[in-house]
Amino acid sequence: DGVGILTQVPHRYFAKACKALGIELPGEREYGVGMFFFPQGELQRRQAMKMFEVIVQKEGLGFLGWREVPVAANVLGSKARACMPAIWQGFVQKPAGVAPGLAFDRRLYVVRRVFEQSSPASYVCSLSSRTIVYKGMFLVGQLRTFFDDLRAPEYESALAIVHSRFSTNTEPSWQRAHPNRLIAHNGEINTIRGNVNKMLAREETMHTEAFGGDLARVLPVVNSEGSDSAMLDNALEFLMMSGMELPLAVTVTLPEPWAHNDTLSRQRRDFYQYYATMMEPWDGPAALLFSDGDVLGAALDRNGLRPARYCVTDDGRLILASETGVLELDERRILRKGRLHPGKMLLADLTKGELLDDDAVRERYAAQCPYGEWLDQNLLRLRDVKVPNQKVPALPRAESARLQRAFGYTYEEYRDSVLAMALNGAAPIGALREKIVTSTAVYVGKNGDLLEQNAENCRVLKIDHPILSDLDLLKIKAMNRPGFRVVCVSILHYKGTPLKTALEHLFVEVDKAYRNGANVLILSDRGVDESRVAIPSLLAVSAVHQHLVKTKKCTALSLILESGEPREVHHFATLLGYGACAVNPYLAHACIAELTEDGLLEKDYYAAVQDYD
């Protein structure tokens, strides 16, 4: 489905190749090189090339010239050749007042983002002063045959990331071959839709001086038409260009298991806790290779669901691959070998000539700021919140029966869901692994600014479990703390009102709460009677969530649902998946109280609710 290679920019080779074309390149890292996939039609290609030149000039950089990349199209299959783009390289001069490395690459990043929005039919494989990507829709053995450049003796690089793609979630294409601009990824990001929605919403709260006044021009951060790997690459690239070191960006997006891992230092757990309040994990099986040209790293997902083995040789080589034996090696030359463990990272700093293990990398980042002090000052835990009257009035049986009819409870659901779940409390599959790796904690309140490290970012409410008891919800409603404003919005409407009209009215109430400073929104269907019915809870949650995403308020408001409707596992899974941070199933809990009173559960109410939740 595709193969590619990411290397450092081979200055000696390009200086020679460009000189033959009449292009005089400046010194190493004094220019950037872009690898372009242009439309096949000559007119479209020329228009796109001219557009790029104009954008480069407008951004205050100098355009040096174009080079058509020599390729052997005859090695391609018929399908790959039919959709093969025109492959060109463009060279851009670094301005005198711009530092080499990241500062120059940031200027090139702005150029690329503006160009992508102006010429959507073109694709930029890479545009950097430090790295370049050669890739295409062919097999591994055809890579060096197809690209003549890769066979040149002058093509030199201290690193190479090679990837062969097998499509899982998207169709094969030239653009979707790996490596992307920073990463090569074996696996899939299962949480991608939620991650992308959160990044979209986060754009409203992110601020950085790195781009000056150019931040709006590089948005949206993520191209939602890309593959899951490409979207992860988009996010990492944006974080890096905003000033976050690439290994730190990888650590934040793919954290190791930390919440229940007592072997980690307190400082390290505080670091992860701080970032967990702002960034959800990009989760799924993943072996990740990444490089910005100065560092080369590898990371494994926290479940360790993809293989990654490495060895270090006595001549200074680090070889890491999904299998051993990808290169023929004399065993006597191997100084060290091993495999990446779940959630761990290996990093080579090419500028310093250092090979850093996971602890060296993570502990350095954990020590950058007083994360523990910030959390002690600002993170509020629901279990620590007290209310004067902690007794919640029980729901009368007659009222419970009426509400069960209103919300469509059946005898089978009552018996097979509510009773069975409260009675059995099934243990998770692989309980030991899940206890270490997974976390049910959710964070409620306004999201902090991911790009600015400060104490206020972690001023949120931490809830250990997303299924709330009536007492938990009472605590949240009664919460009167600086930085928190809780507003309850009814999702009831009068009978006969079209659902569309009811939703529009709900959006008005949500926007009103936002303008009044709310950062915790409780959607409630309490009060159902003869004249008022509830908007279906999943519809209400998903509609409000999408409304907040579209209006870029999603990170400013957390949604909690107070509803009598959810009672099955699937109900809770979909509600949480479609936008609710937490759910209070007050009617299901009332049913458990009745079952306990009737002696159908041989445990007390609180134990039964815990098993049910």
Set out the residue ranges of the language-model regions.
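Active-site or pore-adjacent capping/gating segments
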Residues: 342-344, 348-350, 576-613
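Conserved short alpha-helical segments that host acidic/polar catalytic motifs at enzyme active sites
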Residues: 1-448, 454, 469, 477
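Acidic, glycine-rich active-site loops and adjacent beta-strand->loop/helix elements
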Residues: 165, 324-326, 527, 563-567, ...
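Conserved short loop/turn motifs at secondary-structure junctions
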Residues: 255-256, 524-533, 558-566
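Secondary-structure transition/capping motifs at alpha-helix termini
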Residues: 153-155, 241-246, 511-521, 545-558, ...
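Non-catalytic terminal/interface segments that mediate subunit docking, oligomerization
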Residues: 151-155, 178, 412, 423-552
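Short beta-alpha connecting loops at secondary-structure transitions
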Residues: 213-222, 327-333, 556-561, 590-612
